[in-house]
UniProtKB/Swiss-Prot annotation:
Disulfide-linked positions: none
Species lineage: Bacteria, Pseudomonadati, Pseudomonadota, Alphaproteobacteria, Hyphomicrobiales
InterPro entries in the record: Hexapep, Hexapep_transf_CS, LpxD, Trimer_LpxA-like_sf, UDP_GlcNAc_AcTrfase_non-rep
The organism of origin for this protein: Rhizobium meliloti (strain 1021)
EC class (word): transferase
Protein name (database record): UDP-3-O-acylglucosamine N-acyltransferase
Known function: Catalyzes the N-acylation of UDP-3-O-acylglucosamine using 3-hydroxyacyl-ACP as the acyl donor. Is involved in the biosynthesis of lipid A, a phosphorylated glycolipid that anchors the lipopolysaccharide to the outer membrane of the cell.
Length: 354
């Protein structure tokens, strides 16, 4: 890949210092003064780059690697050529993530859209809104009446912050996002096009066969260190709040219904849909394309496999998959049984479809 001007390399960190900061052991102390400037994949890492390897199946990539160092565990370290210093750790994935935050701090948040700082003259800030010192508002953003925004927060171009919304400190609200009826904590990242705080989907049968809209007068509460992906939608509560717990990370194109409560440090992958009033515990991981029924509970630490349909409660710590979702061991047994029956059926027919 040619030089990437979107994310320029770091001015340089000593390899020895980097090892200390990411909690890894530098096996070759004589390499401590090498300079590291960027991250790169193993196969094209060059001097100044740092890379990592998790699996032996990629060992061939080491033949073209010229990295300043490689992060790996003990099982991989024996494969690394003597010319490449090893940063040894039992958690190479985590160590590499930490290295990336140090070398590419600018890439950790959505980029600026303008070179200006402060409040752009093309932005609209209602006279009753309160902005702490250090807030940045890009052109065409709108800050509604009575909104409050903490210092260090950046509101990107075209974003809309509704009346009375509270946003904490050091947040990033990206281009084109809209936030209504919400209280947002500190160090929250909201990516482009996200929609937060709009009406939930609630209707009652009408007297003549139509539908009557149920009023949605709740809020959205987003706690500290949450990240919300592009074009994700989070509806406000009907009468209670929709809550996203501290440290939870939500991918792009996720729909979260009204009154949903998501715990702390959860991971929710793209195209998940969570129906209203479902409660999700702490540390829950939900794979891509999962549908979650409303008014159910998913316990702490549960894991849901991609493309599953969760129709009923999931106990804490369990791994569920399939449609309807069930314990993973049962799901895999059912899949194996169906594959066996299909194979036997094909044999009886001589391998030809009817």
């Amino acid at each position: 890949m040619e030089q990437n001007w979107f994310f320029p390399p770091h001015q340089g960190i000593r390899l020895g210092d980097l090892a200390n900061q990411i909690g890894a052991e530098l096996l070759d102390i004589s390499a401590a003064d090498r300079t590291v400037r960027a991250v790169a994949p193993v196969y094209r890492a060059k001097p100044g780059d740092i890379c990592y390897m998790l699996s032996r199946k990629n060992r061939e990539e080491l033949q073209t690697c010229r990295a300043a160092a490689i992060i790996c565990d003990k099982a991989i370290s024996s494969l690394v050529p003597d010319t490449i210093p090893v940063l040894l750790t039992s958690k190479p994935h985590t160590a590499f993530a930490l290295a990336g935050t140090l070398l590419h701090e600018r890439a950790m948040r959505p980029s600026y859209n303008t070179s200006e700082r402060g409040v752009a003259p093309e932005a609209f800030v209602d006279p009753t809104a309160r902005l702490e010192a250090g807030v940045e508002v890009e052109p065409m953003a709108v800050i509604g009446a009575g909104a409050e925004i903490g210092s260090g927060t950046r509101i990107a171009a075209g974003a809309m912050i509704g009346q009375g919304v509270r946003i904490g400190r050091d947040c990033t609200i990206s281009a084109g996002a809209s936030i209504l009826c919400a209280l947002i904590g500190n160090n929250v990242i909201i990516h482009p096009g996200a929609r937060i705080g709009q009406d939930g989907f609630g209707y009652a049968p009408g007297p003549k066969g139509g539908m009557i809209k149920i009023v949605q007068v709740g809020r959205v509460i987003i706690q500290d260190h949450v990240e919300i992906g592009a074009n994700t939608t989070i509806d406000r509560g009907t009468m209670d709040d929709t809550v996203i717990g501290e440290g939870t990370k939500i991918d792009n194109l996720v729909q979260i219904g009204h009154n949903v409560r998501i715990g702390r440090y959860c991971g929710i992958v793209s195209q998940v849909g969570i129906a209203g009033s479902t409660q999700i515990g702490d540390g829950v991981m939900i794979g891509g394309g999962v549908g979650v029924n409303g008014h159910i509970t998913i316990g702490d630490g549960a894991q849901i496999a991609a493309m599953s349909g969760v129709a009923s409660d999931v106990p804490a710590g369990e791994r569920y998959g399939g449609i309807p979702a069930r314990p993973m061991r049962d799901f895999l047994r059912d899949v194996a049984e169906m594959a066996l029956r299909s194979s036997e059926r094909q044999k009886k027919k001589g391998g030809k479809d009817e």
